[in-house]
Amino acid sequence: MKILVDENMPYARDLFSRLGEVTAVPGRPIPVAQLADADALMVRSVTKVNESLLAGKPIKFVGTATAGTDHVDEAWLKQAGIGFSAAPGCNAIAVVEYVFSSLLMLAERDGFSLHERTVGIVGVGNVGRRLQARLEALGIKTLLCDPPRADRGDEGDFRSLDELVQRADILTFHTPLFKDGPYKTLHLADEKLIRSLKPGAILINACRGAVVDNTALLTCLNEGQKLSVVLDVWEGEPELNVELLTKVDIGTPHIAGYTLEGKARGTTQVFEAYSKFIGHKQHVALDTLLPAPEFGRITLHGPLDQPTLKRLVHLVYDVRRDDAPLRKVAGIPGEFDKLRKNYLERREWSSLYVICDDASAASLLCKLGFNAVHHPAR
């Protein structure tokens, strides 16, 4: 049994070698010749999986180690009788922590408290729900918009997108990309929406590039609209609008979900799905794969305020480490993908063990996802 795995899927070689012969291949462009005798294909979001790639090939199963699936033609796979699995929620924590790192940087730079801001969350799936929970744990007001979930009657106080635009100081997008249909998200943030944002608002896109109309956004920024922008995703990736990059406050190369934990979850989820598919069901404990974190433990004295939280968050991950490299190489062919391929190891907040002498600080840090304990001062 021959299994092709994306070369940037951590732990894929070791795990899938339990099931067959493993060959690691680049995801963009994928070497088509390798598909001629392969039984399974494990990809990431950079690989377009469709009829033109797989027609006439012996592939029986496709797994994507990503939460999003808009790069996969699921309907064609089903029609062709090819098994499929994604990894829903695998990088949700990573994306939430990316948003926090960005907001805390902007708050420090511009001198505001997040408690004074209302955050509008567009898309309340695995990422949006976790973001809501962490923001509300800090006492920060949130507004939720998710028309599909509202129409299904899912639990939640869902508001219209127009209301979020009118009331939110921070608008952050966490939707799939739907190019048509009743819940179309292509250019959901169009010129009209962008112009309607509150003066000084913060716009964040960490889902799919085309959810925000990049041309319209650049037009508004060039005309002097007072707006802070965080973009991790871009229309036309791996190409991007270099002029737009110069105008945004934070720009990164589609790495919001790139924690080691998130990548490992993606790999293990598709490994478990494929092992079940072939009748050799296996389970992998994530903590048996992950290395020891760079910072083993830290002691925190006193309560948790915003400056202290910012220091803890940026100790684990400071978004500026990914902004600067992109600006240096933007526009150079191949460099966007190279930044992603050679991405520095990044951990989640849970990797940091925090000893607190304040019980409320320990409790709050646990709610935020840190590994915190209360040890009273002696």
UniProtKB/Swiss-Prot annotation:
Its EC number(s): 1.1.1.290
Binding site for substrate: S45, T66, Y258
Pathway field: Cofactor biosynthesis; pyridoxine 5'-phosphate biosynthesis; pyridoxine 5'-phosphate from D-erythrose 4-phosphate: step 2/5
Catalysed reactions, semicolon-separated: 4-phospho-D-erythronate + NAD(+) = (R)-3-hydroxy-2-oxo-4-phosphooxybutanoate + NADH + H(+)
GO MF terms held by the record: 4-phosphoerythronate dehydrogenase activity; NAD binding; protein dimerization activity
InterPro entries: D-isomer_2_OHA_DH_cat_dom, D-isomer_DH_CS, D-isomer_DH_CS1, D-isomer_DH_NAD-bd, Erythronate-4-P_DHase, Erythronate-4-P_DHase_dimer, NAD(P)-bd_dom_sf, PdxB_dimer_sf
Protein localization: Cytoplasm
Biological processes annotated in GO: 'de novo' pyridoxal 5'-phosphate biosynthetic process; pyridoxine biosynthetic process
Alphabetical list of Gene3D superfamilies matching this protein: 3.30.1370.170, NAD(P)-binding Rossmann-like Domain (3.40.50.720)
Active-site residues, record numbering mapped to chain: R208, E237, H254 (proton donor)
CC annotations in GO: cytosol
Keyword Cytoplasm attached: yes
Keywords assigned by UniProt, alphabetized: Cytoplasm, NAD, Oxidoreductase, Pyridoxine biosynthesis
Pfam families (alphabetical): 2-Hacid_dh (PF00389), 2-Hacid_dh_C (PF02826), DUF3410 (PF11890)
UniProt KW Acyltransferase keyword: no
Protein origin, superkingdom: Bacteria
Family membership noted in the UniProt record: Belongs to the D-isomer specific 2-hydroxyacid dehydrogenase family. PdxB subfamily.
Quaternary structure and interacting proteins, as annotated: Homodimer.
Described purpose of this protein according to its UniProt entry: Catalyzes the oxidation of erythronate-4-phosphate to 3-hydroxy-2-oxo-4-phosphonooxybutanoate.
Protein's UniProt name: Erythronate-4-phosphate dehydrogenase
Organism: Shigella dysenteriae serotype 1 (strain Sd197)
UniProt gene name: pdxB
